[in-house]
Amino acid sequence: MDRIIDTAATSEDEAIEVSIRPKRLADYLGQQPVREQMDIYIQATKARAEALDHVLIFGPPGLGKTTLSHVIAYELGVKLRVTSGPVIEKAGDLAALLTNLQPYDVLFIDEIHRLSPVVEEVLYPAMEDFQIDIMIGEGPAARSIKIDLPPFTLIGATTRTGLLTAPLRDRFGIVQRLEFYSPEDLARIVRRSAGILNIDCTTEGAAEIAQRARGTPRIANRLLRRVRDYAEVKAGGQITIEVAQAAMQMLKVDQGGFDELDRRLLHTIVEYFDGGPVGIESLAASLSEERGTLEDVVEPYLIQQGFLVRTARGRMATDKAYQHLALQPRERVSAFTDPEDLF
C-alpha cells in the first residue's frame, strides 16, 4: 500500500536524503537535547583521542537516526561503515566487517534488533574488549582464536527497543531517543531542503507543509517534493501557503496530517460502531484492509496523537477524534474495565 505519509523510506526518499543530509551537528535541526549531549560527548572523545562510546539511537521511523550516525562520524573525523541487522546473517559476516575497520571508525547497524543470537554473541566481546572469538576448523579439531580489533564505535539504530536483548542494550554507553519534531523545527527543515533543491518556497508555504508532516522529516521532505510538482504545473513554480493548501487537498492530506485511510478508520469506528470499542478483526473487515496494515501502519500515529485508544475490548475513538471529524461525541460505556486495558 503506497501512502504519501508512510514513514518507510522509498528509493526516491533514499536518493534525496543523501543530497540533503546535513554533515555537522550545527546543521542537524531539531532534537536539541540530543544535539547538545552528542556535541559534548564528541568534543570530550576527540580531546582524549579515544573511540566514542557505543551509541544506541531509537525512535519512530523517518526521524533521522541514519542521518545522526553520519553526522557523528563526520564530527569525529572518521569513516562510517553502514549495514543493517538482516544483512548480517552469519558470525563470519560480522567478523569481516569488524576486521576491516580502521582505528576509531564508526560501524552503523540499522535495525539492530534483528541481529540473530549467534551474531550477537560475537558482538559482545567486540563491543567490550575490542576482540572477537573465531572458530577455526570443524569437529574435534575445531579451536577458537582471538582476534584483536582496533578501537571503534558501534552505532545501533532501532524502532523497537523492546526487541533488543538486555545484554546487547546494556553494552551501549550512550542511548539517545529521537522524538517527533515540532511544526516549527519541521518548517526549518523544509526551508533548508527547499534551498538545497532549488525550490522556491515561502516561509508560510514551508509552515503549511510542516503542519501536515506528522512530526517526521522524511514525510516533510516527501510532501515538499510533491507540492513542488504541483507548484511547477499549476502556480508558476513558487510554493505559497495557498499553493501548499491546494496541493495537500489534491493529495488528500488534511491539516492533522491524516490521509484518506486514517479518516476512514476513524469514521468507521464513529459511524458504524458508535465510537467503539470494536475488535481489530471487525474493523479490518469493514475497511477491507489487512489486520497487520492497521496495527503496524495506520494505528500507531493515531494512538500517539490521542485520536484512538486500544482497550481490552477493542479500539475506541477519543473525543479528540470526534472534534477532528467535526462530530459531536456520543455517550459511551467505558471500556476500561479490564486490568490489561492498555494491551
UniProtKB/Swiss-Prot annotation:
Binding-site residues for ATP, renumbered to this chain: I20, R21, G62, K65, T66, T67, E128, D129, F130, R171, Y181, R218
UniProt cross-references to InterPro entries, sorted A to Z: AAA+_ATPase (IPR003593), AAA_lid_4 (IPR041445), DNA_helicase_Holl-junc_RuvB (IPR004605), P-loop_NTPase (IPR027417), RuvB-like_N (IPR008824), RuvB_C (IPR008823), WH-like_DNA-bd_sf (IPR036388), WH_DNA-bd_sf (IPR036390)
Protein name: Holliday junction branch migration complex subunit RuvB
Protein residues bound to DNA: R291, R310, R315
Entries under PANTHER family matching the protein: HOLLIDAY JUNCTION BRANCH MIGRATION COMPLEX SUBUNIT RUVB, PTHR42848
Primary localisation category: cytoplasm
Family (UniProt): Belongs to the RuvB family.
Region of interest: Head domain (RuvB-H): 255-343
Residues that, per the record, bind Mg(2+): T66
Molecular-function GO term, any one: four-way junction DNA binding
Organism: Xylella fastidiosa (strain 9a5c)
Function text: The RuvA-RuvB-RuvC complex processes Holliday junction (HJ) DNA during genetic recombination and DNA repair, while the RuvA-RuvB complex plays an important role in the rescue of blocked DNA replication forks via replication fork reversal (RFR). RuvA specifically binds to HJ cruciform DNA, conferring on it an open structure. The RuvB hexamer acts as an ATP-dependent pump, pulling dsDNA into and through the RuvAB complex. RuvB forms 2 homohexamers on either side of HJ DNA bound by 1 or 2 RuvA tetramers; 4 subunits per hexamer contact DNA at a time.
UniProt domain comment: Has 3 domains, the large (RuvB-L) and small ATPase (RuvB-S) domains and the C-terminal head (RuvB-H) domain. The head domain binds DNA, while the ATPase domains jointly bind ATP, ADP or are empty depending on the state of the subunit in the translocation cycle. During a single DNA translocation step the structure of each domain remains the same, but their relative positions change.
Complex and partners: Homohexamer. Forms an RuvA(8)-RuvB(12)-Holliday junction (HJ) complex. HJ DNA is sandwiched between 2 RuvA tetramers; dsDNA enters through RuvA and exits via RuvB. An RuvB hexamer assembles on each DNA strand where it exits the tetramer. Each RuvB hexamer is contacted by two RuvA subunits (via domain III) on 2 adjacent RuvB subunits; this complex drives branch migration. In the full resolvosome a probable DNA-RuvA(4)-RuvB(12)-RuvC(2) complex forms which resolves the HJ.
Region called Small ATPAse domain (RuvB-S), residue ranges: 182-252
Region entry Large ATPase domain (RuvB-L), spans: 1-181
Record keywords, A-Z: ATP-binding, Cytoplasm, DNA damage, DNA recombination, DNA repair, DNA-binding, Hydrolase, Nucleotide-binding
Domain of life where this protein originates: Bacteria
Cross-referenced NCBIfam families: PRK00080.1, ruvB
EC nos: 3.6.4.-
GO cellular component terms listed in the entry, alphabetical order: cytoplasm; Holliday junction resolvase complex
Phylogenetic lineage: Bacteria, Pseudomonadati, Pseudomonadota, Gammaproteobacteria, Lysobacterales
